[in-house]
Amino acid sequence: MRRPEQTPAPGSFNQLHRGDILNVLLDAPSHKAGRAWLRTTIGRAADRRAEVIGLAETGGAILGRDWHDIPMRRTGEGRYSLALPLLEVGCFYAKAFFMPDGCSVPQWPEGPNTHIKVEPAEYCCDNTIYAAFVRQFGPNRSKQAATNEHIREISTLDELGYTVIPRSGTFRDVIKQLDFIMGKLRFRIIQLLPIHPIPTTYARMGRFGSPFAAMDFAGVDPALAEFDRKTTPLDQFRELADAIHERNGKVFIDIPVNHTGWASYLQIRHPDWFAHNVDRSFQSPGAWGVTWEDLSQLDYRHHALWKHMANVFRLWCKRGVDGFRCDAGYMVPYPAWEYIISKVRAEYPDTLFLLEGLGGKLEVVEDLLSGADLNWAYSEFFQNYDRSQIEAYLPGCINVSATKGALVHFAETHDNNRLAARSQCYAKLRTAMSALFSHQGGFGITNGVEWFATQKIDVHEAMPMSWENSENQVEHIARLNAILEAHPAFHPGAELRLIQRGPGNVLALLRRAAERGSSVLVLANLNDDRPDSAGWHEAEFPVTGQIYDLVSGKQVTIDQSSGTLQYQLSPGEVVCFTADQNDLALVQHASGQSMSLPDRSITQAMQAKALEVYCSFHGNCDFSAVNIQNAVRQLSHDPRAFCLAVASDGHLFNHEENPGPVVHTGPAPVTTWEWPRDTRRIVMVPPGWFLHLKCAHRFNVELCS
């Protein structure tokens, strides 16, 4: 007997964003009467979180209460479909089945459950990250290198037994550079290396000590603040977070979840929460054959430690943090992560978790992304250098990014040698490749890359980063980020495929957009010391008219004299070709929109809100006949009228091109609270009504029960 067939395929991994609609098709035996259903956990994230939390805190059981059945719509002989809105962030499962009339045994498609990962709406594109080591924004910022005289002076004091810790850069120093970082360079996410207190006169390595040797995960290092009797170091961190949010950005902080510094808050109060060697000494973590002796490794066999760390993440969310880099996160067990993230998402569902899995097994990273609900991870693209290495690595990276969680291409991290130490040409090459080979704009740099800094970052020091160096790649990076923001080939659903043909240390990456079918071709010469020619088959990226380079903005000529198309690249050159001249205008328009939210992200968030409003009134039903564009237009134009129309009959979701103005009468089920008008009065919100918050400026709001 033929078994039903399902799309998306059983066992497949699928990544979407909040506000998307999941389309499920089932092809059942056509000669049988019956009904089809989708058994899924979608829409019941709270139930799953409650069970995960209960298991860790009270020893409860995972009963699978999040599983439920949704009826599918019959569309033809033996054919059924369901269009399911995705309104919650998390990892979900689904599988369709057919129930013949008069039979109590369902017929299932062959294979395991389908995996559906739903990411926050605002992170659907332009996920550009600027990693800032606050300490480096101090007096050394613009220096090329420390002078020998300065080093000798400090060494003399060291020999006399003094502890010498120079002035550090501060949060306010970083604030002064935000217009450049976020406005000029166009980075949307500011990721701070750890900002917690660190050892000073004891257990310190290097001049300043490592920010990864955290003494208190809840605290802020006073060295990162200016002495100001009106504020605290935490207040000044909040100033930075507010300044980033004011510029439509996101703030991530780095929490080294696997370890603390020696004599930390946790080590003194809970020494049993740490791993010990056979001789009962505290165990230090390590990777790549290096042991970090100034760190003490946590032991996640203790569930009380899980609860403590979950509270640390929740505390920083409350303080305005949007996401976290989870240093050495692959060393934390899967069940601990599942619990921690469940606790955080129960209050802050759109929180972003970036896994630092470098040095860990790839299968561990993939499991944490696809099951434990971490969002992104570091890619190892920066550790692959020539054509053969990248050809071997990139296809797998593309697949994981499209199905389990974006692998972010950092051109350079604090652990690596500076790109410009090899050559400025090489730095531009690797920066452009990291950006234009990224998934949904998941691209990052570490401070100083833009200025061709050559001194490797030492986390125990405050190395100069050549700030305002006259030789730089500022304009180059700004252009790359504008391309990532504007062009649909860098947005969700884009297909990425290597198509280079012929010899040479070159790459050709075809990017085909999902939204309007447009394509771009990225060519890269991996040699920074000699030119090379990149080739591809004409059928892959045909040249029938003019071709333009989005990076330089110039029209180019393609060699069509041989069987494959060819383009001569200068040393280290990276280009991004399009056949559509309108793409140039698209990128240019984005370049002129300083520090604004990407249009694509706004649309995605509005889709999510429109679907959320509808489902709150009508339930999580089939959306096959939805015209989401109509709903988004009306919601943007008049939120109150939109809610009234949806509460009445939901006609805004039909397939009419222009459904016309809302004509319903009566009170809209919406209470408006406006700042500052309503700050001194109690505003009543009836049960089941929406709360519409209005303010002339960007704001954060906390809803407390």
Features from the language model and the residues they span:
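N-terminal structural segment of carbohydrate-active enzymes
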Residues: 2-250, 258-260, 572, 579-582, ...
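Surface-exposed beta-strand/loop patches in extracellular or lumenal glycoproteins
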Residues: 27-29, 36-40, 526-544
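The substrate-binding groove and active-site-proximal loops of carbohydrate-active enzymes
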Residues: 135-139, 153-172, 213-234, 262, ...
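Aromatic- and acidic-residue-enriched segments that line the glycan-binding/catalytic groove
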Residues: 147-149, 198-218, 257-287, 342, ...
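Active-site-proximal helices and loops of the catalytic beta/alpha 8
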Residues: 241, 311-314, 322, 327-407, ...
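Active-site-adjacent "subsite" loops/lids of carbohydrate-active enzymes
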Residues: 263-319, 329-330
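Aromatic/acidic polysaccharide-binding cleft in carbohydrate-active enzymes
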Residues: 405-475
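Glycan-recognition and catalytic regions of carbohydrate-active enzymes
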Residues: 454-520, 526, 630-631, 639-662, ...
